[in-house]
Amino acid sequence: MPPKPINWRMYSKMAVAGITCCVGGPALIYYISPTEEELFLKYNPELQKRSLENRVGKQEDFDNFVARLKEYSKSDRPIWVEAEEAARKNRSGKIEEQAKLMQEMQQRKEEIKKSGTKLMPGGSL
């Protein structure tokens, strides 16, 4: 029994359908998706104003984030390990700073008590 002939018509239909899905789908999404400018123009004026005010701050935050990622990537260790270590150092630094502030407040209170001045209820110390 001779081998079956190749069904070129079926394979060509499948190739056309595959190319249509692989190329046409992303092209359709690209065509339909609005640009940032179009979205911005659809905002109400209050949101546009707020967005313009916050734009510089968000850009600075993003630049700082990218700079930290570049710094983390210089190490041989994974980025998430470096980021976790930096966050831990940041937290411990804040805790130490809060402890120093509390100690200074206690010292001020003691100085006031020693000087004989009465603390007023609702006062700042």
Swiss-Prot record:
Major location (coarse): mitochondrion
GO cellular component: mitochondrial inner membrane; mitochondrial membrane
GO biological process, one term: mitochondrial respiratory chain complex III assembly
Coiled-coil ranges from the UniProt annotation: 92-119
Topology class, membrane: Single-pass membrane protein
Classification via Pfam families: CBP4
Cellular compartments annotated: Mitochondrion inner membrane
InterPro entries linked: Cbp4
Annotated spans, Disordered: 103-125
Residue ranges of the TM segments: 15-34
UniProt keyword list: Chaperone, Coiled coil, Membrane, Mitochondrion, Mitochondrion inner membrane, Transmembrane, Transmembrane helix
Family stated for the protein in its record: Belongs to the CBP4 family.
Purpose: Essential for the assembly of ubiquinol-cytochrome c reductase. It has a direct effect on the correct occurrence of the Rieske protein, core 4, core 5 and apocytochrome b.
Protein name as it appears in the record: Assembly factor cbp4
Species name: Sclerotinia sclerotiorum (strain ATCC 18683 / 1980 / Ss-1)
